[in-house]
Amino acid sequence: MSNLIVHGGTPLRGRITPSANKNAVLPVLCATLLTQAPLTLHGVPDITDVRKILDIFRTLGSDVRMDHASGTLELHHKDTAFDAAAHRLPEEMRSSIMLVPPLLARFGVARLEDNVKGCTLGVREIDPHVEVFRSFGGAVERAQGSLLVRCAGPLHATHHWLDYASVTTTENFVLCAASASGVSTLNNAASEPHVQEFCRFMTMLGVRIDGIGTSRLTVHGGAALGGGEFRFDEDFHEITTFLALGAITGGDVVVRNSAPENFPLIDRTFAKFGVRIEHADGWSRAHREGPLTVQTPFTSNVLTKVEAAPWPYFPVDLLPIFIALGVRAQGNAMFWNKVYDGALGWTGELSKFGAHVFSSDPHRIVTFGGNALTPAVVESPYIIRVAIALFMVAASIDGRSEIRNATPIRRAHPRFVENLRSLGVQVEWTSEE
């Protein structure tokens, strides 16, 4: 377990170039198995989940050449081989489920651990993925603590309607559809920026996809797939994180941002706490006039609300970042996670700083800002943005705080501590058995 120790109270100042979004990188890596042509990917972050997938590729016999210094990855899956009896996909990464479609397409079989994990956000069902695999002609069964997915012949085109706009299920549909001859359509598809980035990679391979960025995708499958080069965009989660860190500490942080078109709702949510975001010339900056203050709604007798749901709603993954702003702001605000049933249990840790947070139900909390906060030792669950949110609060308080179990940060932010130090923060990793 790794912990973060921070000496807070220093306004952050400087410029940051964010890394790529792991939620785009991981599905793209899985998709590379579909082609036997050489590929070069630029901007690949040196994070734990990437290393795990590359280790899988090496085990399967793929040619993997990763330059961690430059973030350039060369892949060639020409000699890849899969044996369902010998090879199991790791359960500790939820993204490993996206290796199933390319393995099905190339080898007719995939074996997946029965308890696929990820961040501890509550129950995360595997059934929607099973429905997609079956829709394309796959057979799914349980065997010796794992899920065995088989396909007797080529995958066939299909039309499918998701009951929930799931990111990974959408990506699994596209991966299956790319290998299935004919036209497949998906309704209620996820449309997050990282899903759009993944779809752009698929089009580079030679897959025609209509409706990218909408809730209806049409995939023309069965074409021979090629190779090429692809460069990842900056992670909008990390952009938002460093803008929020600048705002909560009263500093001045400028963040590289080549896709400000994804930020109108994020910008309006910052404005609810008295923070104005400026985008210019490929960079973004947070401006704060005076203390953080929750803006009073025009409607009488209601709280300012931040409601998080699938894109184009406010992104669920960013909700903890704004909860941190809420406990530091003057005024009260309600935060509503409309997706996960176990994602707000951590907010009790904020009371250790002296914050006042009321849990309405598993999906909603209310922050009562304005309390004088003090340094503390807090424990993060295994949720990336929660560890960062606890760090944000600690960084805004004079004195030494410790964020225990901050390990999940390494899953998404390869240079988090180095970037913080460049902005003037006194912070260090510590480890314990």
Regions found by a protein language model. Name each.
Residues 1-433:
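Short, structured segments at the rim of ligand-binding sites
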